[in-house]
Amino acid sequence: MTMNRFALTLTTLLLMGCGSDKDATQALPSVDNTAEVLAFYETHADFFRAGSIDDLPEDLVWEDGADLPEVGSPKAKKGGTEYVRLADFPRTLRTVGPDSNGSFRPWILDDTSMALAHRHPETLDYFPGLALRWAVDTDSKSVFVELDPKATWSDGVPITADDYRFTFWFFRTRYITAPWYNNWYESQYTGITKYSDHLISIS
């Protein structure tokens, strides 16, 4: 039994040694799909709309969550380490698409990404994330959002309205191999409007 294990281990190591790491060191070619995305915007101009500040409803009531209490107790001891276990081995590092909805997803998306606004755990009202402030227009079933001009991606590039327009292209495209997301973003929203680099509405 022990001899068989040794032979199997040795064979595995030999096979691994025969492989070439040439493919592992080659980076995938970068793809500039700007033309494709812009063409999609034009083809779906009824969804990807453009406006100006003058087009905003005059009676919007803006909110920013400034009246909400601090999250957690000020007496709580900050810092420390929490140890948890994963229910299964990560099937993928994708956040959308095949096998992306596993128990590892909260660690790379749900619990780590920043949304436009987040729910306060006590009051359940919203406080800012990437949004500076927001307003709801019930007549048009739209949410108007002013993005925080200080918000950036991890590389320091500012987050703008174009990023949110691209988000809707991304979730509607068949490239992601995620029919549920395709259906949701095509059926539950009627459009996104860009008023400026930091002002959008989602309907």
Label each PLM-derived region with a short phrase:
Residues T2-T11:
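Sec-dependent signal peptide recognition
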Residues M16-G17:
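C-terminal motif of bacterial Sec signal peptides marking the signal peptidase cleavage site
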Residues S20-V31:
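Bacterial Sec signal peptide processing site at the extreme N-terminus
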Residues K22, K77, Y181-S203:
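Surface-exposed binding/hinge segments that line
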Residues R49-E70, G79-T138, W169:
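N-terminal lobe/hinge region of extracytoplasmic solute-binding protein
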Residues E70-S73, E146-D155, Q188-T190:
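Second-shell loop/turn segments in exported
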Residues P74, R133-A135, G191:
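Short, surface-exposed charged micro-motifs
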Residues R133-T177, S201:
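Aromatic- and charge-enriched surface segment that lines or borders ligand/interaction sites
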